[in-house]
Amino acid sequence: MAALYACTKCHQRFPFEALSQGQQLCKECRIAHPVVKCTYCRTEYQQESKTNTICKKCAQNVQLYGTPKPCQYCNIIAAFIGNKCQRCTNSEKKYGPPYSCEQCKQQCAFDRKDDRKKVDGKLLCWLCTLSYKRVLQKTKEQRKHLSSSSRGSHQEKEQYSRLSGGSHYNSQKTLSTSSIQNEIPKKKSKFESITTNGDSFSPDLALDSPGTDHFVIIAQLKEEVATLKKMLHQKDQMILEKEKKITELKADFQYQESQTRAKMNQMEKTHKEVTEQLQAKNRELLKQAAALSKSKKSEKSGTITSP
């Protein structure tokens, strides 16, 4: 009896071939709890429910620090503290300032000073490295599948040739060699068309045309999204600066207006006081003039009556 192994989720026992690599999950658990990417940090995690779109670490950070902002280096929405995500912050402390990624052209690739850490001699960021490894794994699986299927078909041909005889085997051999020769130029043309674009990583990946095409399209779309995000960020900064200037001008205008009104009120008050003082002085002078005229009249009347 073959040995059985436990699923890491439901703990039921299955043959080793029925469990997934790495996670060691059965088919039902793989369907119920698929491995998805976190909306914020873009790391792969096992989804517990359909509504849960972020990993446990990001969920804890959201509760502690609130909704994250895009990282100023990699543009991943995972900057919970400051303007940089934790991965870029740690990499900057360890390896220094970032360089431009040779695939997505963003300023988020950190040079580890080790050629073995590079991908085909290229300095790539974290996301592009993961995408490359995914494409490489897919290519290996497809090649393995093709080699196993070709091995099985070869064994079937040998069995069929033993049963049918030598003449039929020779005809089958000529047909198979002609079909292989027809397939070779097709693969060559695919390889040439991919390598002329200059977007593939290596000649080995060029044979896997669907994966590399998807990878190139995804990389181009990421580059466009990154440039649009940068443009949007620049526009937002310009709008914020203009709004700041407008508020400063409004505040200055209000201050100048209040100062002018205060000066006008003060001048009006002083003018009123001066006017009142002059009017009072004028009344006093009029009284003095009237008193003088009366005294003069009385003196004249006294001089007339005295003889």
UniProtKB/Swiss-Prot annotation:
One Pfam family matching this protein: FAM76
Chain coiled-coil ranges: 217-299
Disordered: region residues: 141-195, 285-307
Stored InterPro entries: FAM76
Entry keywords, A to Z: Coiled coil
GO CC term (a single one): nucleoplasm
KW Membrane (keyword) present: no
Origin superkingdom: Eukaryota
Compositional bias (Polar residues): 161-182
Entry keyword annotation includes Aminoacyl-tRNA synthetase: no
Family label: Belongs to the FAM76 family.
Protein name as it appears in the record: Protein FAM76A
Organism lineage string: Eukaryota, Metazoa, Chordata, Craniata, Vertebrata
